[in-house]
Amino acid sequence: MGKYDFTSLPNRLGHHTYKWKETETDSEVLPAWIADMDFVVLPEIRQAVQTYADQLVYGYTYASEDLIKEVQKWEATQYGYNFDKEALVFIEGVVPAISTAIQTFTKEGEAVLINTPVYPPFARSVKLNNRRLITNSLVEKDGLFEIDFDQLEKDLVEEEVKLYILCNPHNPGGRVWEKEVLEKIGQLCQKHGVLLVSDEIHQDLTLFGHKHQSFNTINPAFKNFAIVLSSATKTFNIAGTKNSYAVIENPKLRLAFQKHLLANNQHEISGLGYLATEAAYRYGKDWLEELKQVFEDHINYVVDLFGKETKIKVMKPQGTYLIWLDFSAYDLTDETLQELLRNEAKVILNRGLDFGEEGSLHARLNVAMPKSLLQEVCQRIVTTFAKR
């Protein structure tokens, strides 16, 4: 038994928790969708939040030197990534940072590329900013997503792509892109003058011996056209505190990005976010190691159960706590699949089509919950699909 509690289910009802919103009106429904965790938070984060709450004033705040040092230390010790503090830019979230990058480095009507299926806000951010969305389909091979580099280069050139948004580790497929893959991506971007935004928010959640490589550690030359994004919020389940960061080593790109933050009045961050992030990186390493063991156990459980009891094809993730499920072996429409999950199994998974057209007859399962709850979710799915 570990030091930390990953078996208790915190009561999230009545707290305006987005993940559990539908359960508040239908108590039979179990949520296994949006990417946050149903675990008790790291005790030191809770203490930091309580200390903040005990203050008599909740005014404007700034990023302390202690916070900056903790972020630098985390990146250096976990990933061998060393950078000057001037390269660090705090922002309220990774998705707002992506939109800021789109607004800063592209013009309306210009092309932005993403690898689909992928986290839905990528496409949304491109479209709502009136940029031209280019989707480069990932290819499934041996149970993992791969990039078709011939098609990628063709897309970059023919569509005159200005910005490439990469998801590493990949959501929803859980692919941890290796150094060789990132090297090829960087070479293509360098060759064709494409800026790259690397969303690395799941970087800490690599599993089964896989290791994350930050894009800015692959080749020093790549730093000239890269904006790397990350946060403690996904790893430590503190998304509600609203804090993330960009590492932009090219001063020209960084100044342009910061100027746009100021223009959008996005340069001020929650004091709660600063404190929670600092506590997470200072005290959270052991908690994280236990958490990853829990995820590996949960993922193996899902793979084994669905493999034995259903025709659902499971893409076993190399990282993240998200599993991409393929229901195409059943004679279903996308609408019927959603109806079966929501109304018969009484579970909420993310709809595959939200990740792109490649997500047809797929769904994304979140395993970041106590094992007992995960077992109930999965048994409901098994019962529903064993009949078909």
Give the residues covered by each predicted segment:
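Conserved long hydrophobic alpha-helices within structured protein cores
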Residues: 1-4, 9, 65-67, 71, ...
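Conserved N-terminal alpha-helix of the aminotransferase class I/II PLP-enzyme fold
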Residues: 59-92
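PLP-dependent class I/II
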Residues: 24-30, 35-50, 83-84, 89-388
